[in-house]
Amino acid sequence: MSKLRVAIIFGGKSTEHQVSLQSAKNIINELDRTKFDLCLIGINEQGQWHEYAEDNYLINSDNPSTISLSQPLRPVAIIPGSTRQQFISLTDGQPLAQIDVVFPIVHGAYGEDGTLQGLLHMIDMPYVGPNIMSSAACMDKDITKRLLDDAGLAVAPFITLMAHQLNDISYNEVVEQLGLPLFIKPANLGSSVGISKVNNEAEFNAALSMAFEYDLKVIIESAIVGREIECAVLGNEEPEVSPCGEIVLNDAFYAYNTKYIDDDGAKVVVPADLDNAISLHIRQTALKAYQVLNCLGMSRVDVFLTEDNQVIINEINTLPGFTNISMYPKLWQSTGLDYQSLITKLIELALEHHKKTAVLKTKCEL
């Protein structure tokens, strides 16, 4: 049986560029080479696409704060069509070797928001993870919250503010509605980039200014006091949910540095120390959220568990990290599903979903 050729797309013009490089490194290292050949497509911080050699694609690969792309082989682009040869070398105009499936691990803007998924959909390419709509809906915290709330799932009380509305709302009005402390977040970023905890008016104004440097839409939400619990979900029509894991913080909140730089900022506990009934309730909530947002392939569902055992959904991450400290693979490893088998399963799910969509009609038969 011939091997499938997998393109790993990583990097990106995003605040999460370095996180993507860390995730890609682990996926590349763990890919089952008895089943898959490999093509590496890196996107630099200017948004340019290049093919990279496996033995020379990263610089400072073991340092999360300085990891970067190395010297590429050649620039590449995608052209319309559906022949599996849509990745073209811009050096000589020739197609790269046939690619059968893509594993996009571009975190954040342009990779997790439906943009890259739309491009791959246009060339009829199977890809790991959710479709365009699910990606976009889960990336936008405002839309995510509205859809979950409509489905009867609890979310933190929040206000959405657009950049042009900055002068239409006051600190006192927000505090009257949401209380203190608050969190202010760019609506369309991940990895806790641009997020601030607010306890007073000066912090409120500074937090809004910073958040609007990253996005034209901002979420202001009540701070929820509770344990931070995460579940991994895997599958298409019949998804499975992992045991619960817990983030135990030493810092004020789970910020970017806490996640990826500071080894002492937080501790990951798998499985979380929870009563069986509470654990089941959290897992059922994660599954419902996954299905409400029509997710495919994988997602990590993050919730707060309050003192009185309320489960409040924080966010749904459709392309969770695969870094050394990432919760998603750790949760599945706790069930006996090792890293390599998880990656293989995700690729199989991508091919399975594409096979079902490929037979759908694309023209009207009168």
From Swiss-Prot:
Q: Which residues cross the membrane?
A: none
Cell inner membrane as UniProt keyword: no
PROSITE patterns reported in the protein's UniProt record: ATP_GRASP, DALA_DALA_LIGASE_1, DALA_DALA_LIGASE_2
Per the entry, the cofactor note is: Binds 2 magnesium or manganese ions per subunit.
Identify the pathway: Cell wall biogenesis; peptidoglycan biosynthesis
Q: What is its main location?
A: cytoplasm
- Name of a matching Pfam family: Dala_Dala_lig_N
Catalysed reactions listed for this entry: 2 D-alanine + ATP = D-alanyl-D-alanine + ADP + phosphate + H(+)
Query: Which residues does the record give as Mg(2+) 1 binding sites?
Result: 302, 315
* UniProt entry tagged with the keyword Manganese: yes
- State the name under which the record lists this protein: D-alanine--D-alanine ligase
